[in-house]
Every structure is written in C-alpha cells, then in structure tokens.
C-alpha cells in the first residue's frame, strides 16, 4: 500500500476549492498582527467599502463593524455561533459617525450577488487561544471564517482529532 500523507489530501482539497472559484492563500502570506484574531480584516473592510461605496463608510465605521465581529465570545460555542449566524443572515445596523446621517443596515454577505463576495481558502491558519490550534483548511467569506476542515487519514488508527 502506498503511504498516505495528510498534506496530499490538503493539496487536493485546496485544488478542488480553487476549481470551484475560491481564492487560495497560504496562512503565511496573510497580514496578521494578532494570532488570536480569526477575521481577515483586509477582506472584510474591502468588501464593506466595495458593497457600500454609496454610503462612503469611514475607516472608523468599518473598524466598528470589524470590532463587533471580533468581540463575539467563542465560548460558550453555541451562543457565539448563534450570534455570528444572526449577523451573517440578518446583517447589522450601523450608527453613523456623522449623527446627521441615518443609521445604515449592512449585510456582511451579499446573498443577492454572490460574485460580490470574496471567497478565500487558507491552509495551516494558526490561532492562539487557551491553546494553539492550526486547522488544515479554513474557508472565509469576506474575511469571516465560515468552515473548518480538519483532514485526517482514514487508514491511520493512531491519528488524533
């Protein structure tokens, strides 16, 4: 039997994702200052500026949105996941820096025109928390993590999750 390497499966999954339209970026190539943070700030801010160009969002306003997502607690898992799901499906209301402007309802994903979203696959994305985690492949939409792949060998009985 030929040896099986998880890295080969990881490469195959990434190739399939690229064929499906996902942009691939190795984690080492991402600008990240804080390894505890899982958002891709540049992708999120670029989406907001592009999608809501008519609102002329200020850097302070996009920072508020990013902070709202970044400060959702990871534990308890169900509560945090529910809060993120609500933001992704319902959007959020942004109070504008200029009080003369009305509040704006923003959606973090463009369901009407999916091609307006940024789909990014990242491998070996290191995250520091109570312990270090390095998922094999992480999928982001507009800089927001939405899917984790942890690829394991089906033939190695010693593998751990």
Annotate the PLM regions.
Residues 1-161:
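An alpha-helical interface "stripe"
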């Amino acid at each position: 039997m030929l040896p099986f390497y998880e890295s080969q499966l990881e490469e195959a999954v990434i190739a399939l994702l690229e064929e499906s339209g996902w942009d691939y970026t190795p984690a080492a190539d991402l600008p990240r200052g804080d390894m505890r943070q899982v958002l891709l700030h540049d992708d999120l801010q670029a989406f907001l500026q592009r999608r809501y160009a008519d609102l002329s969002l200020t850097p302070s306003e996009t920072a508020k949105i990013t902070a709202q997502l970044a400060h959702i607690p990871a534990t308890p898992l169900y509560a945090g996941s529910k809060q993120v799901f609500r933001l992704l499906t319902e959007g959020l209301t942004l109070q504008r820096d200029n009080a003369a402007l009305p509040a704006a309802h923003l959606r973090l994903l463009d369901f009407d025109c999916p091609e307006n979203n940024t789909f990014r696959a990242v491998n070996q994305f290191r995250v520091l928390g109570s312990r270090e985690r390095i998922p094999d492949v992480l999928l982001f939409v507009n800089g927001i993590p939405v899917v984790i792949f942890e690829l394991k060998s089906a033939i190695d009985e010693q593998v751990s999750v």
